[in-house]
Amino acid sequence: MKHELAGEKIKKELYYAVREIGKEKIQKDISSCIQSSREYIDLLMNKSIDRLISTDQSLDYDRVIGTLSEALLHFMLTISTLPSERKIRLNSELVIDVVIPNLRNLKTNPSKSIIVQFIKQGPELNNVSKLEFIQPNHENIWIVFYRPLSDVK
C-alpha cells in the first residue's frame, strides 16, 4: 500500500473515532478541563489502532503510529485553537512537521516556539540534528517516535 493511501486511511479512521465520540463534546471537555485531553488521546489512539490493525494486517505499525499521532496532534491543535504551521519545507532534505505558533516566530523568538517532529522510520532520526540549526533551544524540539529513542541504534 502506498504511504499516501495508508495515511488517508489512518486519518479516516481517526475522524471516524472522533465522530463516534463527538467533536463538540471533545472540544468542550478539553476546554473545561485540559487534563481530559490525555484521556481523549488514549481513547482516540486505541479506537483508531484497533480498527486499522483489524482491517489491514499489512500496515507498517511504525508508520501507522507516527501518522496517527501526527493527525491526532493536528486535530487537538485545531479544536484547542492553538496557532501552528504544518509541513514546512526548509530545503530539499528537511521538512518540519509542526511549528507552534509559526515559522516567523520561530526565527525571531525561538524560546517561544516549539518544533514537533514525527519520526515514522528510523532513518528520519538523522534529520533531528538539522533542526537544532533553526531551533537552538533543544528542549523546544519535541520528537514523537513509537518507541523510546534509547532503543534506537
What do these predicted ranges mean?
Residues 1-71:
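Interdomain/boundary linker segments immediately adjacent to catalytic/signaling cores
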Residues 63, 74-98:
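A short acidic/basic microdomain associated with nuclease active sites
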Residues 70-74, 128:
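Short, well-ordered alpha-helical scaffold segments within catalytic/effector domains
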Residues 78, 102-104, 132-137:
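Short, surface-exposed basic-aromatic patches at helix termini and helix-loop junctions that form
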Residues 89, 101-103, 148:
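Beta-hairpin (beta-strand-turn-beta-strand) motif
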Residues 90, 104-106, 122:
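Residues that cap or initiate secondary-structure elements
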Residues 100-115:
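Active-site beta-strand-loop-beta-strand hairpin of nuclease catalytic cores
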Residues 111-153:
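Catalytic cores of nucleic-acid endonucleases
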